[in-house]
Amino acid sequence: MREAVIAEVSTQLSEVVGVIERHLEPTLLAVHLYGSAVDGGLKPHSDIDLLVTVTVRLDETTRRALINDLLETSASPGESEILRAVEVTIVVHDDIIPWRYPAKRELQFGEWQRNDILAGIFEPATIDIDLAILLTKAREHSVALVGPAAEELFDPVPEQDLFEALNETLTLWNSPPDWAGDERNVVLTLSRIWYSAVTGKIAPKDVAADWAMERLPAQYQPVILEARQAYLGQEDRLASRADQLEEFVHYVKGEITKVVGK
């Protein structure tokens, strides 16, 4: 199954890795494919997720050239018949090994940055609480395209740090403007956070949605059902459930907080 999914995107993957190698050798230590491609299968709107580890920080010329070339290998969901959205996260070895929280991210590329990149705006290195989640994902399910396996290269993330990162993520969503236009992703991400808070593991979005569905009061189940169906390729109608959606967000945040504190 996993090999078939990777084969499905092998041409695009080769192009992306080629760009990374061209710009980052000889500082490149590892490239790991993680996310839907290796855990749960690619869905219609799934990104190709790559974690890249290097030995030194990127200079500004390399950063800009790499990002501009990555832009040519990626497309927003639904905009290309041959390209998927690509998300690339780059970390410097000594920033994350040994592990400490919160960790520093050297670079992140994704389709949400396209307009900024075209306008000449490039995100600098920054502290990123999500690295606790990302590295946990990579250690649990990933394929090393370059370098050693993730579980050999990276330290395990302590559960306390994972929970802290999950809890911090909850602060992003407080009122409808916070999820407007991104309803499906927010619903599914909340389901994953809830799943992770209870189990200490990370699941594909549709698996976490099924898990959450079994634990939700009946009045919130249509919200997660709509999100799951949209994730699998059906029409996204979540915006029409504004009141239910807001109640769902606050309910699930409350359930998560019971587990992770604050």
From Swiss-Prot:
GO terms for molecular function: adenylyltransferase activity; aminoglycoside 3''-adenylyltransferase activity; ATP binding. InterPro entries: AadA/Aad9, AadA_C, NT_sf, Polymerase_NTP_transf_dom. Its EC number is 2.7.7.47. It is an enzyme of class 2 (transferase). The keyword Nucleus does not apply. It comes from the Bacteria. Keywords: Antibiotic resistance, ATP-binding, Nucleotide-binding, Nucleotidyltransferase, Plasmid, Transferase. It catalyses: streptomycin + ATP = 3''-O-adenylylstreptomycin + diphosphate; spectinomycin + ATP = 9-O-adenylylspectinomycin + diphosphate. Transmembrane segments: none annotated. It holds the Pfam family AadA_C. One of its GO terms (biological process) is response to antibiotic. Mediates bacterial resistance to the antibiotics streptomycin and spectinomycin. NCBIfam families: ANT_3pp_AadA1, ANT_3pp_I, PRK13746.1. This is Aminoglycoside (3'') (9) adenylyltransferase. It comes from Shigella flexneri. The gene is aadA.
